[in-house]
Amino acid sequence: MQVILANPRGFCAGVDRAIDIVERALTLFGKPIYVRHEVVHNKFVVEDLRNKGAVFVEELDEVPDGATVIFSAHGVARSVVQEAERRGLRVFDATCPLVTKVHMEVDRHARRGEEVILIGHAGHPEVDGTLGQYDRSHGGEMYLVETVEDAERIQIRNPDALAYVTQTTLSVDDTLDIIETLKNRFPNIQGQKRDDICYATQNRQDAVKQLASECDLFLVVGSPNSSNSNRLREIAEKLGVEAYLVDNAGQIEDRWLEGKTRVGVTAGASAPELLVQEVVEHLRANGMNTVTEHGGTRENIVFSLPKALR
């Protein structure tokens, strides 16, 4: 019986940077350090940082005057930044640089008075933050589209001054049909730059696709509120492989392993390798004697910390 590890898997550069920002701030300024929203969507990471002195809040009114606050990797609306400035809070922005690039695109279109369609999941903090970048004072409007049906129904004012952007945790494949629908309806719609698309999301999904045909079970390490982790599980299932999302090895059920001989393992972009190795050890203890690494795209991207934390 064999365990095959997908590559790449686990932490991306944006998550690494966000965690480093919180830990560095704790080292330099001491606890408590306030973090608006979970810095990344992983229960283990959040609890670890909480134990080190991070205090997670959902809104800035929970942060005392004079405190240090960190914005999560998902990004925040302009109004949140403005409130922090008004209150004189010391702020460190852990927004993923790839999310920031999308924010800049939205701002550029807004200043031109162009309408923008955001392809993403309603209620996800990244989507809330990106929608909150759009300045309507220039006469434009921004819309959220989640499905092909939304794209077929959406009504906009000027199809010749229109652009779309996407939530970074959605891959090219995730958005393909929606974008095609928008292009058919609005031939002059402007697309986002190719390098604005999150490399990590695409690479992790491609790794699952390449590995799925070799497995009769797939385990994805990640938290239930992690968008990209859920998508990895869905991809394996669509390819006909039984798949489960687990926060840790303790959530693996014995019945899942019955009759299985080749188990694929991957991790969402916010799940640490420590949890993957615990899953591997659990599988070893259940008779999976061989562990191999599946070939995949090598990632060497590193995002720098804010100057004040270097």
Curated annotation (Swiss-Prot):
Record note on cofactor:
Binds 1 [4Fe-4S] cluster per subunit.
Q: Where does [4Fe-4S] cluster bind?
A: 12, 96, 198
Which leading EC class covers this enzyme?
Answer: oxidoreductase
Q: Which Cys-Cys disulphide bridges does the record give? A: none
Reactions it catalyzes: isopentenyl diphosphate + 2 oxidized [2Fe-2S]-[ferredoxin] + H2O = (2E)-4-hydroxy-3-methylbut-2-enyl diphosphate + 2 reduced [2Fe-2S]-[ferredoxin] + 2 H(+); dimethylallyl diphosphate + 2 oxidized [2Fe-2S]-[ferredoxin] + H2O = (2E)-4-hydroxy-3-methylbut-2-enyl diphosphate + 2 reduced [2Fe-2S]-[ferredoxin] + 2 H(+)
What does the record give as the active site?
126
CDD domains, per database record: lytB_ispH
Keyword annotations for this protein, in alphabetical order, are: 4Fe-4S, Iron, Iron-sulfur, Isoprene biosynthesis, Metal-binding, Oxidoreductase
The entry marks the following residues as binding dimethylallyl diphosphate, namely: 41, 74, 124, 226-228, 270
Query: Molecular function (GO) terms listed?
Result: 4 iron, 4 sulfur cluster binding; 4-hydroxy-3-methylbut-2-enyl diphosphate reductase activity; metal ion binding
Task: Tell me which residues bind (2E)-4-hydroxy-3-methylbut-2-enyl diphosphate.
Answer: 41, 74, 124, 168, 226-228, 270
Gene3D superfamilies reported in the protein's UniProt record: 3.40.50.11270, 4-hydroxy-3-methylbut-2-enyl diphosphate reductase, catalytic domain
What Pfam families does the record tag this protein with? LYTB
List, alphabetically, the InterPro entries matched: LytB/IspH (IPR003451)
Annotated pathway, please?
Isoprenoid biosynthesis; dimethylallyl diphosphate biosynthesis; dimethylallyl diphosphate from (2E)-4-hydroxy-3-methylbutenyl diphosphate: step 1/1; Isoprenoid biosynthesis; isopentenyl diphosphate biosynthesis via DXP pathway; isopentenyl diphosphate from 1-deoxy-D-xylulose 5-phosphate: step 6/6
Q: Where does isopentenyl diphosphate bind?
A: 41, 74, 124, 226-228, 270
On the tree of life, the source organism's domain of life is: Bacteria
Could you give a single Gene Ontology term from the biological process aspect? dimethylallyl diphosphate biosynthetic process
Cofactor dependency: [4Fe-4S] cluster
What EC numbers are recorded for this enzyme? 1.17.7.4
Its job = Catalyzes the conversion of 1-hydroxy-2-methyl-2-(E)-butenyl 4-diphosphate (HMBPP) into a mixture of isopentenyl diphosphate (IPP) and dimethylallyl diphosphate (DMAPP). Acts in the terminal step of the DOXP/MEP pathway for isoprenoid precursor biosynthesis.
The record's family statement is: Belongs to the IspH family.
Official protein name in the record: 4-hydroxy-3-methylbut-2-enyl diphosphate reductase
Q: Which gene encodes it?
A: ispH
